[in-house]
Design a protein with these regions (language model features):
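Nucleotide/pyrophosphate-binding catalytic subdomain
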Residues: 1-119
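Fold-independent oxyanion-binding glycine-rich loops
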Residues: 7-10, 44-48, 61-63, 71-75, ...
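Flexible loop/turn segments at secondary-structure boundaries
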Residues: 13, 50-52, 89-90, 145-148, ...
Length: 280
């Protein structure tokens, strides 16, 4: 197959945030459509771009998949195919659960929900530009190439949905309250999130009450101690490390899977479609 090499850094223009750069969509779209000839097959890199100075930047988690979505959005592609080491988008991680199922066809909306809740195969950054232009996304296995994989596109969801289990181990649970036991207001939460952002806590779950604000997320052990010390300047802080976050999407009952039943429930949240547990 004849092809032509092109450096992604000449096409994908980003901000100066080197580890999780923001794409300058207008500049990127202009460069890609100025340079790319759609009659030629190109080979390029994923994960990287360049800032205005031409310095290399990276696109963050799942940046290579995101690169494919960027090219597709700019070129108004008919479809994006991403090759993985799994048979498609699974309803649970086989490292933690038996009898997993491939989600053969789901909507962009459901894929974004699963990604937000912690599903690890596809990041929401990849899905969003494809949804904006209604470009279908196919997830295929480079090991089982005859497998049809998963298809994410704009479809009407059936009423009977497959239950998905998302398990995130080694999280930290923080419970934060004011020193004078006054109510937790918006200004407190704003200050708390500013500290989270500065020190690097990735929040996966939040729960608010009148007197306390609890979050479950992931952070390194070293940064956790720094975070707690910073919060304790103005707040009372309690925390549990090495907790696990279980999310059940499209649940059919409220039972925790048997393999996790010996764990203590620290937090339980429930909506119409999703139930979440913080377990210890």
């Amino acid at each position: 197959l004849k092809n032509q090499w092109i450096d992604a850094r000449t096409l994908i223009k980003t901000s100066n945030q080197f580890l999780e750069s923001k794409v300058n969509w207008e500049a990127t779209n202009n460069e890609i459509n100025r340079i790319i000839n759609q009659n030629i097959t190109y080979v390029s890199q994923g994960f990287i771009g360049a800032n205005q100075m031409g310095e290399t930047t990276t696109l963050g988690r799942e940046g290579s998949d995101f690169t494919a979505a960027i090219f597709a959005w700019c070129l108004d592609s008919n479809e994006v195919i991403i090759w993985k080491d799994v048979d498609g988008l699974l309803n649970a991680d086989p490292k933690y659960f038996n009898r997993t199922k491939v989600l053969k066809s789901i909507s962009f909306k459901e894929a974004i929900e699963l990604s937000y809740l912690g599903a690890s195969v596809i990041h929401q950054n990849t899905i969003k530009p494809l949804e904006n232009k209604n470009i279908p996304l196919s997830i295929r296995s480079f090991i089982n190439t005859n497998n049809s994989g998963s298809y994410i596109k704009e479809i009407v969801e059936s009423k009977e949905k497959i239950t998905s289990l998302i398990y995130k181990p080694n999280q930290v649970l923080l419970s934060i309250s004011t020193r004078d036991y006054s109510f937790i207001f918006e200004e407190h939460i704003s200050e708390i999130f500013s500290i989270f952002s500065k020190i690097g806590l990735k929040v996966h779950l939040m729960q608010n009450s009148a007197l306390s604000f609890s979050v479950c997320g992931i952070i390194s052990n070293k940064s956790l101690l720094i975070l707690v010390a910073e919060l304790q300047k103005n707040y009372i802080v309690k925390y549990n490390d090495k907790v696990n976050l279980l999310t059940i999407r499209n649940f059919k009952n409220l039972e925790i899977p048997k393999s996790l039943k010996n764990q203590e429930i620290l937090i339980q949240q429930r909506s119409r479609t999703t139930i979440r547990y913080v377990l210890k």
